[in-house]
Regions:
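N-terminal membrane insertion elements
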Residues: 2-127
Length: 132
């Protein structure tokens, strides 16, 4: 169904591309906080995953709108079919693995920091109680 509608495919591609761009922008804006927390490897993996996903959907838009202008419609359709049948799997796999790895590294690091803060708060509360 989606495959039969260029407008629907383009809408999905653009939506995914916009979400990836917004997420990358958000990661970039908060990169210093990630660096301060020691979670830069996680940030980098998330950026790679989002970029891979974005590049795939950008290539899909290229095969839908630019390639037909440069070659025949049949060649463009064959390229789009090749993109979806042969290249979508590795791109999705790389994207998901990088996003999962990035989230795992980042959440592990941030949970360690939360644990440190909780212990520090508890220690401080104990010291305040003893000093009263």
């Amino acid at each position: 169904m989606i495959w039969e509608s260029t407008a629907l495919m383009a809408t999905v591609d653009i939506a995914i591309l916009l979400v990836a761009i917004l997420a990358l922008r958000n990661l970039y804006r908060h990169r210093q906080r990630f660096a301060d927390s020691g979670a830069m490897r996680g940030l980098a993996l998330m950026a790679v995953g989002l970029s891979a996903m974005g590049f795939f959907h950008l290539a899909d838009l290229f095969t839908m709108f630019v390639l037909p202008q440069l070659s025949s419609a049949a060649d463009a359709m064959a390229a789009m079919e090749n993109l979806h049948l042969n290249y979508s799997w590795p791109f999705i796999l790389v994207s998901v693995l990088c996003l999962f790895g990035g989230f795992s590294i980042t959440s592990r690091r941030l949970l360690l920091l939360v644990g440190d803060l909780t212990r520090s708060r508890s220690t401080l509360a104990d010291e305040l109680t003893r000093s009263e």
